[in-house]
Amino acid sequence: MTIAHGHDHAHAAKGESVELKHFGKPDEVREFPKGRVELIRIGGATIGRAIFEPGWRWASSVQPIAKTRSCEAPHFQYHVSGILRVLMDDGAEFDCKPGDVSLLPSGHDAWVVGNEPAIVVDFQGMLDYAKSGR
């Protein structure tokens, strides 16, 4: 069995496809004020690494692009670094810290707490994130 990097597929002995990608070479990058999302398409899914700089807030950085009252993308995230405070539309508020895994339904705002960038890997909800008209 061989493993192909990048956009290539390798076929395992049983006909299964093996893919290996790296966030250092994303398929797409979406930039917005004080942040960016690096997207990788793999196994039929879109995985995103989001980097939010200090001072980033969804309501001011992404809302003008999304044109929705709050973030409508559900998220299933692993929090790599920094602190991300989340405010749900129902009023629940909590912090996501390094090592946390969060499952957020649509209907929320979020912002970086402190002076360290918040970095998350999102396994759901990145397909249309920070895309005009979402």
Residue ranges and their predicted role:
Residues 57-58, 82-87, 110:
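Short beta-strand segments in beta-sandwich/barrel cores
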Residues 49-71:
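Conserved short histidine dyad/triad with adjacent acidic residue
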Residues 1-51, 59:
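A short, N-terminal "cap"/entry segment at the start of jelly-roll beta-barrel domains
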Residues 39, 47-51, 76, 93, ...:
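Conserved hydrophobic/aromatic beta-strand scaffold that supports enzyme active sites
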